[in-house]
């Protein structure tokens, strides 16, 4: 059976790995997952994200999680827009997360970016997830 919501699966894998205090989490790779992982690295929520080619030409995305004083850096990570109900917002309606302390992941015509970058660029898009 094929996976319907790859981004939701990615976020759930990260959440479960952090609750189990894992060092890293591996998952099948895609361009969307890689760009979301790169955004999490740039925002400081995860240590690194690397794509490796496995046997049979299957790419695997490995995300190294980040902890501070024994606690996970990511407090909450949740899917906002989902396959059954897509959530698109204009540049003025992009929500802030935890009064600016978190980040909303926005899929725009110029790629995946944070809510702050989308507002600065003056473009809206699909609100993929919230991370705080």
From Swiss-Prot:
Residues making up the signal peptide according to the UniProt record: none
SUPFAM superfamilies the UniProt entry points to: Ribosomal protein S8
A single Gene Ontology CC term: ribonucleoprotein complex
S-S bridge residues: none
Lineage: superkingdom: Bacteria
UniProtKB keywords: Ribonucleoprotein, Ribosomal protein, RNA-binding, rRNA-binding
Subunit structure: Part of the 30S ribosomal subunit. Contacts proteins S5 and S12.
Record PROSITE patterns: RIBOSOMAL_S8
Function comment: One of the primary rRNA binding proteins, it binds directly to 16S rRNA central domain where it helps coordinate assembly of the platform of the 30S subunit.
InterPro entries tied to this protein: Ribosomal_uS8, Ribosomal_uS8_CS, Ribosomal_uS8_sf
Full protein name: Small ribosomal subunit protein uS8
Entry's family note: Belongs to the universal ribosomal protein uS8 family.
A molecular function GO annotation: rRNA binding
NCBIfam families: PRK00136.1 (NF001109)
GO biological process: translation
């Amino acid at each position: 059976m094929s996976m319907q919501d790859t981004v939701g699966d990615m976020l759930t894998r990260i959440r479960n790995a952090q609750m189990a205090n894992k060092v890293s989490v591996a998952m099948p790779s895609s361009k969307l997952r890689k760009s979301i992982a790169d955004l999490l690295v740039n925002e400081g929520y995860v240590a690194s994200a690397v794509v490796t080619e496995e046997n049979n030409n299957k790419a695997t995305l490995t995300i190294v999680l980040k902890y501070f004083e024994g606690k996970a850096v990511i407090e909450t990570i949740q899917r906002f827009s989902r396959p059954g109900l897509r959530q698109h917002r204009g540049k003025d309606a992009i929500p802030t997360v935890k009064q600016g302390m978190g980040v909303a992941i926005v899929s725009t015509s110029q790629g995946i970016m944070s809510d702050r970058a989308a507002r600065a660029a003056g473009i809206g898009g699909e609100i993929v997830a919230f991370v705080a």
